[in-house]
Each structure stands twice: as structure tokens, then as C-alpha cells.
Amino acid sequence: MIINHNLSAVNAHRSLKFNELAVDKTMKALSSGMRINSAADDASGLAVSEKLRTQINGLRQAERNTEDGMSFIQTAEGFLEQTSNIIQRIRVLAIQTSNGIYSNEDRQLVQVEVSALVDEVDRIASQAEFNKFKLFEGQFARGSRVASMWFHMGPNQNQRERFYIGTMTSKALKLVKADGRPIAISSPGEANDVIGLADAALTKIMKQRADMGAYYNRLEYTAKGLMGAYENMQASESRIRDADMAEEVVSLTTKQILVQSGTAMLAQANMKPNSVLKLLQQI
């Protein structure tokens, strides 16, 4: 029997200390819901999880970017529909005044409406905006030196696409003459020419609207793909990082029992020197 070193107490204390640390770790996992709360819990798992989290955050924002792009196109297409309706009306008036039965006075009255409609085309072009960006003044046309509209549709660098919108002013649509005056229908011949100009303007608008529709559909598919990737990556990160609550509860119960038994054994070990004292008392 020895008294200077109580090895049983030291051993019991060591086991108790490690079990208490394990209980603290398990309780931390249960309180946070995360299996990995620091690099010490699982260094390689944390590294993989952080990479996945980077992609998850990027995918979520890319999805929002794509939806913003869809809103941008919807807004532009709505304004362009108004412009198309106006030019359709100009074309109808041109067909009407191409008929020779109208007097000059009649044509002047129709010209007033045509001029007003041309002015409305310019008003739409000047006031059509999205987040203070002018849509139809050539800012997003091909070859524009002013600016460009980029949609970033992925979680990583350079995963973006450029979108173009042609200039849709009355000048670009050739609804005004070289001197800036609106197209005239003062004679059947001029009115007949206006029909051709209206057709050309409508063709340009229809092509632009078709491009918008195709790009909108593309963005819609992109958004769906991003949502799917976001969901799958989040599931992958969850499997690595999240705690299995049932498993952690079982582990906590086991470790708490070990702590309680370790405490009891430490108390028993601390009583061993008393046996030496009793032996000495018999001398």
C-alpha cells in the first residue's frame, strides 16, 4: 500500500475529465444542431462543408440575379408592347389615308394623330426605365460604348451573359424624317410609304420581342436549374455538418452515465488512504 501517489484517484480523475469534455461537446452539438462547430470537431469535414457553403450562398444569389433579369425583361417587353400597339395604329391610319377619297383637310386631321403617336413613341423610349436604367435609348444596344447589361447567372466568376436591347426611339424606328419632323401622310403616295415604314418598324420590334421571349425562357430554365443545384448542395452540406439529434442524445446519455460513475469511483479512490490510516492506528 502506498500513500504518496493515489494512482486509482489519478486514473479516475483522468477518465472523469475526458468524459466531462465529451459531455460538453455533445451538449454543444445538441444546442446548436451542428455536428461540426469548429475545425477541431472534424477538420476535413469543415473544409468540405465550407466549400459547399460558398457554392450554396453563390447559387442562392445567382438565382436572385436570374429572377431580377426576368423582371428586367418583363418590364422592357411591356413597354415595347405599347410601342408596337402605337405603330400598329400608325399603320392603320396610313392605310386609311392611302385611299384617295380623303381631302387635304381630312389628311391634316389624321396627321395630327400620327404626329401625336410618333411623339408617344419617343415618350415611351425616354421614360421606359428599370432601376433608373433607360431601356430603349441605345444604352444596351449591340456595340454601345455607354454601358451593357450583364446577368450573372452562376455561383462563380465569369458565369454571366450579356443582354441586348436595340434603340427604340422614333428616329431609330424611322418614324421621323431627316429634319426631325414626324412622317407625313399628306398625300396617298406618302401615306403608302408610311405603310412600309411602319412594317419595317414593327419587324424590328417583333424581332426584339422575340429575342426577349427567348432570353426570358432561358432565364427561367436557368433559375430552375439553380434552385435544383441549391437544394442538392444544401442537402450535401447538411449531411456533413448537421447533427443527428437522436444519435447525439444517445451519446449524451452514455457519457453522462460515465461521468456519474467516474465521480463515484473518484470518491472511492480518495477513500483508499483511509485504509492506510486504519492500519497505522493498529500499531
From Swiss-Prot:
Compartment(s): Periplasmic flagellum; Periplasm
One matching Pfam family: Flagellin_C
GO MF, one example: structural molecule activity
Coarse class of the protein's main subcellular location: periplasm
Cellular component aspect of the GO annotation: periplasmic flagellum
The entry's keywords: Bacterial flagellum, Periplasm
SUPFAM superfamilies to which the protein is assigned, alphabetical: Phase 1 flagellin (SSF64518)
Protein family per UniProt: Belongs to the bacterial flagellin family.
PANTHER family: FLAGELLIN (PTHR42792:SF2)
Quaternary structure, from the entry: The flagellum consists of two outer layers around a core that contains several antigenically related polypeptides.
Function: Component of the core of the flagella.
Protein name: Flagellar filament 35 kDa core protein
Protein source organism: Leptospira interrogans serogroup Icterohaemorrhagiae serovar Lai (strain 56601)
Primary gene name: flaB
